[in-house]
């Protein structure tokens, strides 16, 4: 009996030992819903050779932002890391529970502020690229390529090699060869188990012109990474809109539908106010990035304080980023000041958003098709996102979607008209932009509806919703005098198509949203302003009418001013985020009768407005609203530069 008891006791402790020893190690950052990585550029190797410097910087960064991983760079702009110090530095981090992976910036530096890439027609540049890859492969099992792996050179050798090909075709073909011959094969020859991750930048509309290739190249690498840095939307040269930090990660998830998109990456550049940095962090994580990389180690470790920037308009409001709370939360290492810096801005903001991410399911949105290697109405989806339309961008035609949104870039699919017809014939709907209509009007789209862009433009400031004999009402905001918007003129046949939203200039009407029944589906044409950013200047009534048709059966839709985004998830949760400098009030419409809505952060249960089942004769329009399910409406006050998280239950 005693022997049996001892055997059972031994078996119990041995089982416990196995369970503990086989459990995955705890990550240093301690976040529940994501990992945090910090990218160390190549010059860190020189500083980190002094272990006292390394220890001091490590303590400082970890006190500001808890992190799980570092990407340690071995090459950038003609500079190599000291190989002799790499293993020692790696051990320092791994001994403290931090994962260490490699980094490469395969670029040659630039001139006059422009980015410079290798000239891959030069043997010495090809050799240097290969050498850098081989060094990384010797020291790391995972290596990420920073987003300078493109091709700008137009040397005499490049011009001769290009021949009669376009620059786009030449660069795509060249970079496909470079990817295999100078990166993947050399790395795997040295380290067969290596994983090479390619980070793609934020200018996805123009990739093909510089040799980036989401169609083939992105599939060859072991994973991809997403540049979600959007910075300031008004003063930078790119003018990227805030919504892109979410949208581009979702798009790249669909490019690598096998789960190969490893995360999002932001930096601290070109910011006019401190809130803009956490907004990029939050939006990357609202897109469900499994990892977020902070570029770079230096601003995380710097001793210099940062300025909150131009945020006087909202600094006393209850915003999601609270400058004072962030400053007071920092406990510096002994002997250092408590001055705030970007590291603590990141750390505080990540800690806050980690509280709610677990309540969000898988992101969903209105599906929009952008073929590989396509351009047209560039970055339009981010402007649509910023007027409150959740977008799910995909490189494959989404035949399963109830409605497909097609912008001008869809013209790069030679079979797009046939796909549209098939979709409509199956009882589903298609909405095309005026840019795509113009591109296809001599390529078969008139088989669906004989509408065309005339080439003329008109300035519109008055808008009407509703249609039918004597029906319609102003969509202008009586409290705000909206500016005039320049739009293309679309010609159509009366009674073949109906303008469910129209603009009026003097005594003439111009369609903003056209509707046509084709087979079993509905075909829409959405007129896009000549300046896409004028979507922000459309009256709120116009954008809400567009949403009613585009999101007819969508779980949640939002009546809102511009610069307020909506992120929706398949478990009924959603996020409302304002990028505005002022307070805003929105109305969210949730599918279902008497749905309960709860603020996921405060626990507050919101009071519903009178439930609206669409359409109703007492609505202010007669037939402007499409048939749809019963919905429950709620009014929500949103502070400036803030997000609110909600969960629903029937």
Give the predicted meaning of each segment:
Residues 1-7:
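N-terminal secretory signal peptides that target proteins for export/translocation
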Residues 6, 26-28, 60, 188, ...:
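Generic marker of residues within folded, mature protein domains
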Residues 8-22:
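Bacterial N-terminal signal peptides
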Residues 19-22, 189, 485, 508:
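Compositionally biased, intrinsically disordered/low-complexity regions enriched for serine, proline
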Residues 26-399, 405, 413-416, 424-425, ...:
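Glycan-processing catalytic domains of CAZymes
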Residues 408, 412-650:
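A conserved amphipathic helix/loop scaffold
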């Amino acid at each position: 009996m005693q022997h049996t008891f001892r055997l059972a006791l031994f078996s119990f402790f041995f089982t416990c030992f196995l369970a503990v020893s086989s459990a995955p190690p705890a990550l240093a950052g301690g976040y529940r819903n994501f990992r945090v990585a910090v990218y160390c550029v190549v010059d860190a190797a020189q500083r980190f050779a002094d272990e006292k410097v390394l220890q001091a910087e490590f303590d400082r960064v970890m006190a500001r932002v808890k992190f799980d991983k570092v990407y340690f760079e071995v090459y950038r702009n003609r500079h190599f890391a000291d190989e002799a110090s790499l293993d020692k530095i790696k051990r320092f981090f791994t001994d403290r529970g931090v994962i260490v992976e490699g980094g490469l910036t395969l670029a040659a530096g630039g001139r006059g502020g422009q980015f410079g890439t290798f000239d891959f027609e030069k043997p010495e540049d090809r050799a240097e690229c290969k050498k850098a890859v081989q060094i990384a492969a010797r020291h790391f099992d995972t290596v990420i390529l920073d987003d300078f792996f493109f091709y700008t050179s137009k040397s005499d050798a490049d011009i001769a090699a290009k021949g009669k090909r376009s620059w786009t075709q030449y660069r795509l073909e060249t970079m496909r060869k470079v990817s295999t011959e100078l990166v993947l094969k050399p790395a795997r020859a040295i380290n067969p188990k290596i994983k090479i991750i390619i980070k793609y930048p934020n200018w996805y509309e123009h990739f093909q012109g510089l040799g980036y290739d989401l169609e083939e190249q992105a599939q060859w690498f072991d994973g991809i990474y997403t540049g979600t840095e959007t910075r300031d939307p008004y003063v930078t040269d790119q003018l990227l809109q805030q919504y892109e930090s979410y949208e581009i990660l979702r798009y790249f998830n669909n490019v690598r539908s096998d789960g190969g998109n490893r995360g999002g990456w932001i930096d601290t550049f070109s910011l006019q106010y401190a809130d803009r940095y956490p907004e990029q962090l939050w939006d990357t994580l609202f897109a469900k990035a499994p990892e977020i990389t902070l570029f770079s180690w230096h601003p995380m470790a710097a001793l210099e304080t940062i300025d909150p920037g131009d945020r006087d308009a909202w600094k006393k409001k209850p915003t999601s980023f609270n400058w004072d709370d962030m400053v007071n939360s920092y406990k510096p290492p002994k002997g250092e000041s408590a001055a705030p810096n970007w590291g603590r801005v990141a750390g505080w903001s990540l800690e806050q958003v980690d509280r709610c991410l677990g309540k969000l399911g898988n992101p969903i949105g209105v599906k929009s098709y952008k073929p590989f290697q396509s351009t047209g109405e560039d970055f339009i989806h981010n402007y649509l996102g910023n007027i409150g339309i959740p977008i799910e961008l995909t490189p494959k035609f989404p035949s399963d979607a109830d409605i497909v949104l097609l912008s001008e870039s869809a013209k790069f699919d030679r079979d797009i008209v046939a796909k549209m017809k098939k979709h409509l014939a199956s009882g589903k709907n298609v909405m095309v932009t005026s840019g795509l209509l113009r591109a296809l009007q001599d390529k078969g789209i008139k088989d669906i509806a004989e509408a065309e862009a005339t080439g003329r433009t008109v300035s519109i400031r008055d808008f009407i919703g509703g249609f039918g004999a004597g029906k319609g009402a102003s969509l202008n905001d009586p409290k705000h005098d909206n500016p005039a918007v320049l739009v293309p003129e679309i010609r159509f046949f009366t009674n073949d198509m109906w303008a469910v939203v129209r603009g009026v200039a003097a005594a003439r009407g111009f369609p903003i949203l056209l509707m046509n029944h084709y087979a079993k589906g509905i075909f829409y044409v959405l007129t896009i302003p000549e300046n896409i950013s004028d979507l922000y200047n459309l009256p709120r009534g116009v954008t809400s009418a567009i949403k009613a048709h585009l999101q007819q059966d969508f779980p949640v839709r939002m009546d809102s001013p511009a610069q307020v985004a909506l992120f929706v998830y398949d478990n009924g949760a959603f996020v409302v985020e304002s990028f505005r400098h002022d307070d805003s009030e929105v109305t969210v419409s949730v599918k279902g009768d008497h749905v309960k809505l709860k603020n996921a952060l405060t626990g507050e249960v919101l009071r519903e407005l009178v439930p609206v089942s669409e359409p109703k004769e007492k609505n202010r329009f007669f037939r402007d609203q499409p048939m749809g399910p019963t919905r429950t409406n709620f009014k929500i006050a949103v502070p400036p530069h803030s997000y609110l998280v909600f969960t629903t239950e029937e």
